């Protein structure tokens, strides 16, 4: 397996995914992973769960059948100031928060709007990763976003599902990957799995990483130790 930790996947709690948390963990084990982040959509996503779900993730065992389970969220950015749909009191209970722009939660604006939103989200200490920034619906100043991620030791996601469900994402993702290499910025390889068989699917992302010779030490989920070290950078000491 090219990566050891899945950093972006959804359960039935998201409202439009099809497996339980335990089924996702079991599939991660079947695929030889060592860890999985459960990153269900925040409450502004139609059909998703309430903030109480995220507060209560602390009851989920840290290990299930030998697989480390990280408590996460794909929070929805809900304005162009970078606010997300969970209070800080919920965010700071989680291990790995992704912030993303979704058109059902915020309408596309200008490049300046989108860039301001992502930069502001990056500056939030409880947000560790920007989700699918290659989405062509939300064009951004890629260099400004990547440089801000560098300043704050945050990760930029290269979202494998984008190559299949977000038309014209490829060119944006390649440019973002090149900029992350240029500036030494962390990336996360997210499958964005909404069904268990897609866990750890990174076929296109892996090809691009190999083609552009992206440093493996900057891939936060390449190994479990990489991921734990990335979390430690942000004050999260998980054993």
Curated annotation (Swiss-Prot):
Keywords: Hydrolase, Metal-binding, Zinc. Zn(2+) 2 binds at residues 16, 41, 194. Its EC number is 3.1.3.-. Transmembrane segments: none annotated. SUPFAM superfamilies: PHP domain-like. Binds 3 Zn(2+) ions per subunit. One of its GO terms (molecular function) is zinc ion binding. InterPro entries: Phosphatase_YcdX_put, PHP_dom, PHP_phosphatase, Pol/His_phosphatase_N, Pol/histidinol_Pase-like. Zn(2+) 1 binds at residues 8, 10, 74, 192. Zn(2+) 3 binds at residues 74, 102, 132. Pfam families: PHP. Its cofactor is Zn(2+). HAMAP family: YcdX_phosphat. Belongs to the PHP family. NCBIfam families: PRK09248.1. This is Probable phosphatase Csac_1188.
């Amino acid at each position: 397996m090219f990566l050891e930790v899945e950093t972006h996947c959804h359960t039935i709690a998201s409202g439009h995914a099809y497996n339980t948390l335990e089924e996702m963990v079991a599939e991660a084990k079947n695929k030889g992973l060592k860890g999985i982040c459960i990153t269900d959509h925040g409450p502004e996503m139609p059909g998703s769960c309430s903030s109480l779900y995220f507060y209560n993730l602390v009851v989920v065992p840290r290990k299930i059948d030998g697989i480390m389970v990280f408590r996460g969220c794909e929070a929805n950015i809900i304005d162009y100031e970078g606010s997300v749909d969970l209070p800080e009191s919920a965010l700071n209970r989680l291990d790995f928060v992704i912030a993303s722009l979704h058109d059902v939660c915020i309408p596309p604006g200008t490049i300046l709007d989108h860039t301001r939103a992502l930069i502001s989200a990056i500056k939030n200490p409880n947000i560790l990763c920007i989700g699918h920034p290659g989405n062509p619906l939300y064009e951004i100043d890629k260099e400004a976003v990547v440089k801000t991620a560098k300043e704050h030791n945050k990760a930029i996601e290269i979202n494998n599902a984008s190559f299949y469900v977000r038309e014209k994402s490829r060119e944006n993702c390649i440019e973002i990957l090149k900029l992350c290499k240029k500036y030494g910025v962390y990336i996360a390889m997210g499958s964005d799995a909404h069904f268990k068989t897609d866990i750890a699917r990174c076929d296109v992302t892996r090809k691009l990483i190999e083609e552009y010779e992206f440093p493996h030490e900057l891939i936060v989920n390449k190994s479990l130790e990489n991921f734990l070290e990335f979390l430690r950078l942000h004050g999260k000491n998980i054993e």
